């Protein structure tokens, strides 16, 4: 009999924490979509896709967690920068607490 249980898929884990990861990158500095993507990949999230990041930025913006502004670019089209606003910083703080509690629980379950 073949088992239907598969190893943990990192892309599935990423879906659950992409909002937190994007907010954390923007907490360090304002950024446009590609900069946020580079920040995530530099932190070790190489699997994250462009469309996922751009979609997350739009969703967080429409949820009122980010502000945006446009900066002219000499290398092509203008760039839309995103920054955390007060609601975004509050969400980042709440999500960080939740993440630490969850990660601690998982660490106790699976061990170090």
PLM feature spans:
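Amphipathic alpha-helical dimerization/coiled-coil segments
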Residues: 2-6, 89-112
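Short beta-strand/turn micro-motifs at beta-sheet edges
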Residues: 8-12, 70-71
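N-terminal helix-turn-helix DNA-binding core of bacterial DNA-binding proteins
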Residues: 10-54
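Short, hydrophobic-biased segments on the C-terminal half of alpha helices
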Residues: 54-61
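Beta-hairpin "wing" of winged helix-turn-helix
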Residues: 63-75, 83
């Amino acid at each position: 009999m073949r088992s239907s249980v598969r190893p943990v898929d990192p892309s599935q884990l990423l879906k659950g924490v992409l909002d937190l990861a994007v907010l954390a990158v923007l907490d360090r500095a304002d950024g446009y979509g590609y900069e946020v993507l580079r920040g995530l990949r530099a932190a070790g999230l190489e699997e994250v896709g462009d469309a996922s990041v751009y979609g997350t930025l739009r969703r967080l913006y429409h949820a009122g967690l980010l502000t945006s502004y446009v900066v002219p670019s000499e290398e092509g089209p203008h760039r839309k920068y995103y920054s955390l606003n007060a609601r975004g910083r509050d969400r980042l703080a709440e999500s960080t607490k939740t993440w630490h509690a969850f990660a601690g629980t998982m660490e106790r379950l699976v061990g170090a």
